[in-house]
Design a protein with these regions (language model features):
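Membrane-embedded helix-loop-helix hairpins and adjacent transmembrane boundary segments
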Residues: 2-552
Length: 552
């Protein structure tokens, strides 16, 4: 975002709003510190939070650079097809997590996703996933930190490196002090701040272009044309703005990438694990699915508005890259006061995203790497101290990875590439192991490793020009699909040749051998029909399907 062309004309009121937000965030972190007495308090909030808090934190943790800057950039670049990331690429997987997978996570009392893999398979599988997850989190933290720094650079004219360091220090302060509780309660606050900051962009932008009908007419006259207004039309081939076939959208995005992210990404699952009982844990991602349905109104729609109002948007470099769609609209549309709220909303979104990455990293590093392989029988105070040190380490590394993200003109493409490499193989291993009890520990390890290698090789071959796709996103969709297929094939080959675990060892870890049933909701005092995870989940999926009708 370099250059004075994006400098926002902030006044004292705008700076006051932003300053109050920073003070509040730090205050919440210090307030949460009083509740931290053990490592479980620091890493999992003592498993004591209500469903509405964990649900809002669940969706807020995802409202980072991927959601705000990335989805607005995609809206401008690919049009309405971007809604696939929400209605088929998020909601069904969130519902599946709540209904099917949370009973295994929460019921087995695991502290992390890698720990589940240790119990289900073996220590090599556990270590491989713990390391790959830790690497992924610091890379994605860098994306959020880079996006935060871009906004601060445009806001204050600071050098990019200085803005990155300042943003990192603020996130570091409230997580190190307040642990997961500090992150989660700030995420609830950040959810409302983010929405308050983005809604004016959509409303004022629509007024400027003549309402919804005016926006549609303008998109038809843009370089996207009529295709920019449809989600599914034209997906019988790759001749569409996204450059993706419906099979890649449904299988690559809707199944492998989506389920891989939402059901096995510990940065998200951690929010549900902090819930106070099984029912609250199961409802956490489902509650989050409802606001998720509506987020395109403040991300995709502004992207379309930027497409038709910002001349020259879509350059390869400079101020007019797609990543700048939202900041450009803020500069052009918002009056002072409202501008301060919008800037605060953006800053909140990037801090929420980075906090989720850092809190996930410190838990996995402490429990799944340090405790499991280096210092197994230390005091609880020792692990609490290690967790805080890991937090500092994650932020420092995130500062470095922020400069990697700076090399991508569309950070959404970068994030999807990371998901295809890290999440897709994990999901394949996870879901097959959960539903096929015969899958052996060695099959779990070799499946996860092989899937990761195939996804990485696909990406590198594409970047090296050896193989071609219509777009970076199509490569991510097919890379994820190939990784999943590789996991399935390797599992089928290795399993008959190696020894499985006994049913006693797998009780509570695989489908059909679990003591955890739907009846647990009544044991938790949450048996009311309107709190049923199944009912709430089915309604969310139906709404997602209905939302497609006007833009099919």
């Amino acid at each position: 975002m370099g250059g004075g062309g994006l400098r926002l004309d902030m006044n004292a009121v705008d700076y006051l709003i932003l300053g109050l937000y920073f003070v509040t965030v730090l205050g919440v972190g210090f307030a949460a510190r009083r509740a931290i007495r053990t490592s479980v308090d620091f890493f999992l909030s003592g498993r004591s939070l209500p469903a509405w808090v964990t649900g809002l934190a669940f969706v807020s943790a995802n409202l980072g650079a991927l959601e705000i800057i990335g989805m607005a950039a995609n809206g401008a670049q690919y049009g309405i097809m971007t809604v696939h990331y929400y209605w088929i690429g998020a909601v069904p997987a969130m519902v599946f997590l709540g209904i099917v997978m949370m009973p295994f996570y929460y019921g087995s009392k695991v502290r992390s996703v890698p720990e589940y893999l240790r119990l289900r398979f073996n220590r090599p599988t556990h270590l491989l996933n713990a390391i790959s997850f830790a690497v992924a989190q610091v890379l994605i933290a860098g994306v959020n930190l880079y996006a935060l720094a871009l906004i601060m650079q445009a806001l204050l004219g600071w050098p990019l490196w200085f803005a990155i360091v300042v943003g990192a220090v603020i996130v570091l302060a409230y997580i190190t002090v307040g642990g997961l509780s500090g992150a989660i309660y700030n995420e609830v606050l950040q959810f409302f701040v983010i929405i308050a900051g983005l809604v004016p962009i959509t409303v004022i932008g629509l007024v400027k272009v003549g309402g919804v009908s005016g926006l549609m007419d303008a998109v038809r006259d843009s370089k996207l044309g009529e295709a920019g207004l449809h989600a599914w039309e034209g997906t019988g081939s790759t001749d569409n703005p996204l450059g993706a076939h419906w099979l890649g959208i449904v299988f690559g995005l809707g199944f492998v990438l989506s389920f891989g992210y939402w059901t096995t990404n510990f940065a998200e699952v951690q929010r549900a694990l902090s819930a106070r009982n099984m029912s609250a844990a199961r409802r956490t991602p489902i509650i989050a699915a409802y606001p998720k349905l509506l987020i395109p109104a403040v991300t995709v729609i502004p992207g379309l508005i930027a497409l038709v109002t910002v001349k020259g948007l879509g350059a390869d470099e400079g101020d007019l890259v797609y990543n700048n769609a939202i900041p450009l609209l803020m500069r052009d549309l918002l009056p002072n006061g409202v501008l301060g709220i919008a800037v605060t909303g953006l800053v909140a979104s990037f801090m929420a995203g980075m906090a989720a990455n850092v809190s996930g990293f410190n838990t996995v590093f402490t429990y799944d790497i340090w405790q499991a392989y280096f210092r197994r029988n230390e005091s609880d105070e020792h692990y609490l101290k290690v967790g805080r040190i890991a937090t500092v380490g994650a932020v420092v590394i995130g500062i470095g990875t922020a400069f990697i993200a700076a090399g991508f003109s569309n950070i959404m493409n970068y994030i999807q590439a990371l998901f295809s490499v890290f999440n897709a193989p994990l999901f394949g291993t996870f879901i097959i192991g959960m539903f096929w009890r015969r899958m052996t520990p060695l099959a779990g390890f070799w499946s996860l490793l092989s899937g990761t290698v195939v996804a990485t090789a696909t990406y590198l071959l594409y970047k090296g020009g050896v193989i071609s796709f219509n777009s970076d996103l199509e490569e991510s969709f097919w890379g994820a699909g190939l990784a999943f297929a590789t996991v399935a094939v390797v599992a089928a080959i290795v399993t008959p040749l190696t020894r499985p675990k006994t049913d006693d060892q797998l009780t509570g870890l695989v489908y059909g051998l679990s003591d955890t049933t739907l009846a647990d909701d009544s044991l938790a005092g949450d048996a009311a029909w309107y709190r049923s995870p199944v009912l709430l989940g089915v309604v969310a999926v139906i709404l997602a399907a209905l939302f497609y009708i006007p833009v099919f």
